[in-house]
Regions:
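P-loop NTPase motor core
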Residues: 32-41, 49, 53, 98-192
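Conserved P-loop
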Residues: 33-102
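Short low-polarity hydrophobic stretches
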Residues: 1, 66, 70, 117-120, ...
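Glycine-rich, acidic loop segments that terminate in or are immediately followed by a histidine
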Residues: 197-198
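Phosphate-handling catalytic cores of nucleic-acid transaction enzymes
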Residues: 13-14, 201
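Pre-Walker A adenine-sensing motif
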Residues: 16-31
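Charged, amphipathic alpha-helical linker segments immediately N-terminal to NTP-binding catalytic cores
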Residues: 1-13
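Conserved small/polar residues in nucleotide/adenosyl-binding loops
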Residues: 203-205
Length: 205
């Protein structure tokens, strides 16, 4: 029989949260280090830049693995790395482009394996919803960040929609702004500025 938690049991649970600064905690609060993230956005919304900025910030708290299934390490990806000065995260940030589901599991089973795993994108990975759930259950102390394509302002595909529902942090990037729509909302009305010049350009259109 599975354990049933009492209110006292639940109140006694402790979480290690991300101790990040105001730039991040205002829009996103202080999520647990092992919280699951779901980030969606249309093409050219600033989503990729936001994900890279988040990855760089998380390097302060552990090793980050970026599964770049969608872009690989093409010229655009390289330019984004340079623009965001990802060289400052040398030794904490790793990128793989063609790792299989089984190979990822083998990597994560090793000592000192990555603490934060960014899957970009869920659709291009071609994993099924049960695969994603099984991965998070198998490695409950790790943080999985799922990046999703969109179609008509919604995550593309039924599996992505289901995955969004179960993730702790639900982020949508629109017009170079990242909004928290999930369970750990920060300050009301706040958002993360991905690219200020981009926001200004939209205002003046």
């Amino acid at each position: 029989m599975k354990r049933a938690y009492s209110p006292k049991d639940i109140a006694a649970k402790k979480w290690v949260t991300l101790p990040w600064g105001e730039k991040w905690n205002k829009p996103f609060g202080f999520p647990a280090e092992n919280a699951s993230w779901f980030i969606s956005g249309a093409s050219a919304s600033g989503k990729s830049s936001f994900v890279m900025q988040l990855g760089k910030e998380l390097c302060k708290y552990g090793l980050v693995l970026y599964l770049s299934y969608e872009e690989g390490v093409n010229q655009t990806f390289q330019r984004r790395m340079e623009y965001l000065k990802m060289n400052e995260a040398q030794g904490k940030f790793r990128v793989v482009v063609d790792e299989t589901y089984e190979e990822l599991i083998d990597r994560l089973k090793k000592p000192k394996s990555p603490k934060f795993i960014i899957v970009d994108s869920y659709q291009v990975s071609e994993w099924e919803y049960p695969d994603a759930v099984a991965l998070m259950k198998r490695f409950p102390k790790k943080c999985f960040i799922w990046i999703s394509q969109e179609k008509k302002s919604q995550p593309m595909g039924g599996g992505a929609i289901r995955l969004r529902y179960i993730c702790d942090m639900k982020i949508r990037v629109v017009g170079y702004k990242a909004y928290c729509q999930g369970r750990a909302i920060g300050e009301a009305g706040s958002y993360y500025v991905v690219w200020e010049e981009g926001i200004l350009s939209l205002i003046h259109i």
